[in-house]
């Protein structure tokens, strides 16, 4: 394997773009903190961090395999390894299988409940790329998939999925729909041309209102989570800071343009970090 092929595999796994990994990792780590009522055991941190990174790469590979014919028509994606012919579909499938096995080995160190949930997580990861063909809001499926680690974190530590896990899960789904709609704005013109479905296409001229609506719902659910868990004022201060980030992002993505939309999308990882920090503060 030469240097060019290694670079192609690196690009296929999107390791040069860590922001989506962080968007998955922060809610998962936050769930570990909530489930542990404090800092979790280091073994959980290692297992779930590896799991997030590996499954994110698996999702990217599945997405590129599913979209290889569509990506040829989109300026932002027509240089991807599969689309440009740097790697074959067979190469991608073998890499995907290998990484999935790595993730499964990690989950074997957890309890049976979590092992069973891992199959649901894999199903969602496979389902999402194909939803763009028939489901009007594939961002909803992405939200289910990206944040499923929340359920797995609670099941691993508590062997159950309590009410607070559901509240937090739904909050992060709303958040994901909002930030991935921003991301989809960058490709909306191409999606309309080739018939790909997305929330950015569905919401049309009201897309900015819907993004703000889902941001608001995520904040509201975080407040409900804080009340349910009897969190202190630092938690609500963090929610206020998150709302300011949402407002800042609004003025960025409202300008449209690929760069503005991608930058607004990327900034959301700071919101995930803030929520993680204020969760940790609750148990110090």
Curated annotation (Swiss-Prot):
Annotated catalysed reactions: all-trans-octaprenyl diphosphate + 4-hydroxybenzoate = 4-hydroxy-3-(all-trans-octaprenyl)benzoate + diphosphate
Alphabetized UniProt keyword annotations: Cell inner membrane, Cell membrane, Magnesium, Membrane, Transferase, Transmembrane, Transmembrane helix, Ubiquinone biosynthesis
Record-listed E.C. numbers: 2.5.1.39
Protein's membrane topology: Multi-pass membrane protein
EC class name: transferase
Pfam families attached to this UniProt entry: UbiA (PF01040)
CDD domains registered for this protein in UniProt: PT_UbiA_COQ2
Gene3D superfamilies cross-referenced by the UniProt entry: UbiA prenyltransferase
InterPro entries assigned: HB_polyprenyltransferase-like, Prenyltransferase, UbiA_prenyltransferase, UbiA_prenylTrfase_CS, UbiA_sf
Main location: membrane
Residues spanning the membrane: 19-39, 42-62, 85-105, 107-127, 134-154, 165-185, 211-231, 233-253, 261-281
Cofactor (UniProt): Mg(2+)
Matching PROSITE patterns: UBIA (PS00943)
BP terms from Gene Ontology: ubiquinone biosynthetic process
Functional pathway: Cofactor biosynthesis; ubiquinone biosynthesis
Single GO term (MF): 4-hydroxybenzoate polyprenyltransferase activity
Location of this chain's protein in the cell: Cell inner membrane
CC terms in the record's Gene Ontology section: plasma membrane
Family: Belongs to the UbiA prenyltransferase family.
Role according to the record: Catalyzes the prenylation of para-hydroxybenzoate (PHB) with an all-trans polyprenyl group. Mediates the second step in the final reaction sequence of ubiquinone-8 (UQ-8) biosynthesis, which is the condensation of the polyisoprenoid side chain with PHB, generating the first membrane-bound Q intermediate 3-octaprenyl-4-hydroxybenzoate.
Name the UniProt record assigns to this protein: 4-hydroxybenzoate octaprenyltransferase
């Amino acid at each position: 394997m030469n240097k060019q092929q290694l670079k192609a595999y690196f690009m296929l796994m999107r390791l040069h773009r860590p922001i989506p990994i962080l968007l998955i990792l922060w809610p998962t780590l936050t769930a570990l903190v909530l489930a542990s009522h404090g800092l979790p055991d280091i073994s959980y941190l290692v297992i779930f961090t590896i799991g997030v990174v590996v499954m994110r790469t698996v999702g990217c590979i599945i997405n590129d395999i599913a979209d290889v014919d569509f990506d040829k028509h989109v300026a932002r994606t027509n240089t991807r390894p599969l689309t440009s012919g740097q790697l074959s579909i067979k190469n991608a499938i073998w890499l995907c299988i290998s990484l999935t096995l790595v993730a499964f080995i990690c989950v074997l160190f957890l309890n049976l409940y979590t092992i069973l949930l891992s199959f649901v997580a894999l199903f969602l990861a496979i389902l999402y790329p194909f939803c763009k063909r028939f489901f009007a809001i594939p961002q909803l499926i992405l939200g289910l998939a990206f944040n499923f680690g929340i359920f797995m974190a609670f099941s691993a530590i508590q062997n159950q999925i309590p009410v607070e896990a559901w509240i937090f899960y739904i909050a992060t789904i709303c958040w994901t729909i909002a930030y991935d709609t921003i991301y989809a704005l960058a490709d909306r013109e191409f999606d309309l041309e080739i018939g790909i479905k997305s929330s950015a296409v569905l919401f049309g001229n009201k897309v900015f209102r819907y993004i703000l609506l889902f941001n608001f719902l995520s904040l509201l659910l975080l407040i409900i989570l804080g009340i349910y868990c009897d969190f202190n004022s630092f938690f609500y201060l963090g929610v206020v800071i998150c709302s300011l980030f949402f407002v800042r992002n609004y003025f960025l993505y409202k300008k449209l343009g690929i760069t503005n939309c991608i930058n607004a999308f990327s900034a959301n990882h700071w919101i995930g970090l803030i929520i993680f920090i204020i969760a940790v503060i609750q148990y110090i």
